[in-house]
Regions:
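C-terminal output helix
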Residues: 105-114
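Active-site residues of response regulator receiver
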Residues: 52
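Helix N-cap/capping motif at the beta->alpha junctions
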Residues: 17, 30-39, 60
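Two-component/phosphorelay signaling modules centered on CheY-like receiver
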Residues: 10-29
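As written
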Residues: 60, 92-98
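Conserved acidic carboxylate
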Residues: 7
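Hydrophobic/aromatic residues positioned on beta-strands within the core alpha/beta folds
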Residues: 79-80
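The feature encodes the CheY-like receiver
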Residues: 56, 70
């Protein structure tokens, strides 16, 4: 399984890197900016894209707005956010992202999320 994490929080990035390192069947790429994430999404195929909504300069919202709804639906994009603003969350649901994943989260919740999007063989 190939995962892209686009997250500017270094603690979350490190946890994800360690987590994926323990899972031999997960190839996890971690980038710390929306712009770099956008480039990776355009140039590589991922089974799951975990995208932080609030990042400086080029945010997760900017990344989402770079794609059409149909493109996002095909890409399995899940938003990572600590936001509890119902308006923002509702707008994100209407963009084609698969779901909103609230921070903070447990490793158990992360495992459940990853398994949900694992390609079926």
């Amino acid at each position: 399984m190939k995962i892209l994490l686009v997250e500017d929080n270094l603690e979350i990035s490190e946890v994800m890197t360690v987590y994926c390192g323990l899972k031999k069947d997960i190839d996890c790429k971690v980038v710390n900016s929306g712009q770099e994430g956008l480039e990776r999404i355009r140039n590589e195929n991922f089974d799951l894209i975990l995208l932080d909504l609030a990042m400086p300069e080029f945010s997760g919202k900017d990344v989402i707005q770079s794609f059409t709804r149909d493109q996002l639906v095909q890409k399995n994009v899940v938003i990572f956010t600590a936001s509890s603003d119902p308006g923002v969350l509702e707008r994100m649901k209407n963009t084609g992202v698969k779901e909103i994943f609230k921070k903070p989260f447990s490793l158990e919740q992360l495992t459940e999320l990853i398994e949900k999007y694992r390609p079926r063989q």
